[in-house]
């Protein structure tokens, strides 16, 4: 009988030892899985978890939870400067851990608190697994989730079944995430959304610093704010200042206007947009775009400028116009009204190319109010085999089609008429050209008019005579196929020479120049500036100015 009792006692103790080993192994495995982010071995603390109070305590070594003290009613623990309250708990004193149930409340210092329905706390590794209706509060930040692991040793909280962080006006949600109570930085992964006032960010990866309220998005992301949409793969946005820094070829969309660049800086509070590196500004409504390596545009004032390989494209007509200058500026007047208009300034070294027209000048201004483009300082324009130049050229448009052109002071029009060096030429103080459906139909030359014009044989179009004419005013009418129909002149004097008998000094007007070596050859050639050769510049004429009145 004694031997049987001894055998029975040995078997019971053997079972207790086995169960204890299995429990310890299970807790060790849970701790390992709960902290997959730490590759190095976790240090452990010897500080014990202490039971402060419980209305009821019982211990059942042979019950459902062997090795646990079963606590009920106003349960209170302390550990390493933290406190834990709950309705009931299993206290594993040997393992230095607690499983808490009902109205779980955890507090660490004066800045961190956590509430949930159920929690496991391992005192040795200072790890808490909180489940169901979890609310973590740290300073001014609040994190909501249903599954959270809080690592006190590394001051990190992880959620992995959806969570929401609220920081003042900022609200962030995602599937997975982590929050550091030490640095107050948070990371969010998969299905990430951030709401801040009128701003809305969607991405798959976002890092957020609660101290600065700066969010860093990584990967394909969209930022929406007050009518502006940003597409980016790498950006920093500050919800406090409403500013964003965009990298990795980002795009800002503002209605029918877009800006794309390698690096963009967007200030939503004042509308400033700065771009660096292959920046492209597109105006879909007006069918034009501006490109440069350095570009600025303010969407509220409509002011912008471009430098470093600045390029303007206009595709409002059938063929695209390409224009380059060292710098370009755009000014918008009466913005957000029905009377809005813009001015574009390009300077210096302006070169433009379109298949049917090319131009060069030192500076250019386009005013959309009167649809006038003015070219200053040695302007030259080419159309097919015709060249026109003067001190200043103004071109007026109607629905993106040339309506009128004015050449002011030292006007010269030259047309190359055959394979040999024969040119139709007109020089005057001023020249006006009128267009119909984009084709020049009439030209008026005014003041000190001199002209050389070749007649052709109607049968074989061979040049037959040269007409030299001097007058004060002359009007030329052109056919739709650019042929001269008739000429009107007042008090003209002139001479007609057979082509074979033209004196050498009558082949060219005194102001004749043919600037084919300056003419842009294609859209890529506009970036190479070529000035006039020495001796071919326009004459410098002193203009008399009326003296200012003085009042003594």
Task: Walk through the language-model features, giving the residues of each.
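N-terminal amphipathic/hydrophobic interface segments
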Residues: 32-552
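Bacterial Sec-dependent N-terminal signal peptides
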Residues: 1-40, 552
